[in-house]
Design a protein with these regions (language model features):
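Short beta-strand to alpha-helix junction loop
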Residues: 1-11
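Poly-acidic low-complexity segments
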Residues: 3, 30-31
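Helical element adjacent to the flavin cofactor pocket in flavoenzyme catalytic cores
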Residues: 12-20
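Short secondary-structure junctions
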Residues: 20-27
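Conserved C-terminal structural/oligomerization subdomain of aldehyde/semialdehyde dehydrogenase
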Residues: 29, 36-153
Length: 153
């Protein structure tokens, strides 16, 4: 992470894991020199948990179980933020259906955070306004106007 305040914030998510959930890997600061945190997976979270409802902005993936695609969509979209999500499945058709239904600015399939300059990056809902990266990022800095004249008049 990029500063001591964010380090403390991310670590607070590790200290606040509910009893029904568990850190399956990671969850520790790598060293006291710098602001490095192990890549972390927190599993068995519930919809109301802080880890699901807030943006962590650290090397953390949260995992929820679901019964069917309808429930997966309801859980994923049942948050006020919408920056990014990921779908993990061996069924590509399912992944595409879920990606289309998820209300997030970025949906990654079988990966997480592969940000590239050629693709727009930015969220929906309370996760920011507009896009950065790619040609779409320029639209936030432009004001389009249509002007037409009849030169024969």
């Amino acid at each position: 992470v990029n500063n001591p305040n964010q380090l403390a914030r991310v670590k607070s998510f590790f200290e606040d894991v509910p009893s029904h959930a568990k850190i399956t890997t990671g969850g520790k600061q790598v060293s006291r020199d710098g602001f490095f945190i192990e890549p972390t997976v927190i599993a068995d979270l519930k919809q109301g948990d802080r880890h699901i409802q807030e943006e962590i902005f650290g090397p953390v993936i949260t995992v929820q179980k679901f019964k069917d695609e309808a429930e997966a969509i309801k859980l994923a979209n049942g948050v006020v933020y919408g920056l990014a999500s990921s779908v993990w499945t061996s069924n590509h058709s399912r992944a595409m259906r879920l990606a289309k239904a998820f209300d997030f600015g970025c949906v990654w399939i079988n990966c997480h955070i592969p940000v590239v300059a050629e693709m727009p990056h930015g969220g929906y809902k309370r996760s920011g306004y507009g896009k950065d990266l790619s040609a779409y990022g320029f639209e936030d800095y432009t004001r389009i106007k249509h002007v037409m004249t009849n030169l024969g008049a």
